[in-house]
């Protein structure tokens, strides 16, 4: 298995798909990295030479990926919460941020339903 940016890339996949195992790299960016490194994106990871892997590592190193990207994302959310702006408050309450309705739906963001309180007679 090839190791790029601290992630093991599966051997059986094409280079374009294998690079998407790295957090922060999707199909488009993966393709751009392969072109910049001069590696055919249809080539399997197990068929890559050490020189190809080194070029890919160098190209991936130009982007913010994995732990740094996760840290940056959480810091951005924390900043919004500290500011107390609308988006920060919605993050804090665990509700949708972008104007979606919450009277019905929004179950993914709100979590499972709580049991309704039974009425005492």
Curated annotation (Swiss-Prot):
It holds the Pfam family Ribosomal_S13. Keywords: Ribonucleoprotein, Ribosomal protein, RNA-binding, rRNA-binding, tRNA-binding. PROSITE patterns: RIBOSOMAL_S13_1 (PS00646), RIBOSOMAL_S13_2 (PS50159). One of its GO terms (molecular function) is rRNA binding. GO terms for cellular component: cytosol; small ribosomal subunit. GO terms for biological process: translation. InterPro entries: Rbsml_uS13_C, Ribosomal_uS13, Ribosomal_uS13-like_H2TH, Ribosomal_uS13_bac-type, Ribosomal_uS13_CS. Transmembrane segments: none annotated. Residues 94-121 are annotated as: Disordered. Located at the top of the head of the 30S subunit, it contacts several helices of the 16S rRNA. In the 70S ribosome it contacts the 23S rRNA (bridge B1a) and protein L5 of the 50S subunit (bridge B1b), connecting the 2 subunits; these bridges are implicated in subunit movement. Contacts the tRNAs in the A and P-sites. Belongs to the universal ribosomal protein uS13 family. Part of the 30S ribosomal subunit. Forms a loose heterodimer with protein S19. Forms two bridges to the 50S subunit in the 70S ribosome. PANTHER family: 30S RIBOSOMAL PROTEIN S13/40S RIBOSOMAL PROTEIN S18, SMALL RIBOSOMAL SUBUNIT PROTEIN US13M. This is Small ribosomal subunit protein uS13. It comes from Paraburkholderia phymatum (strain DSM 17167 / CIP 108236 / LMG 21445 / STM815). The gene is rpsM.
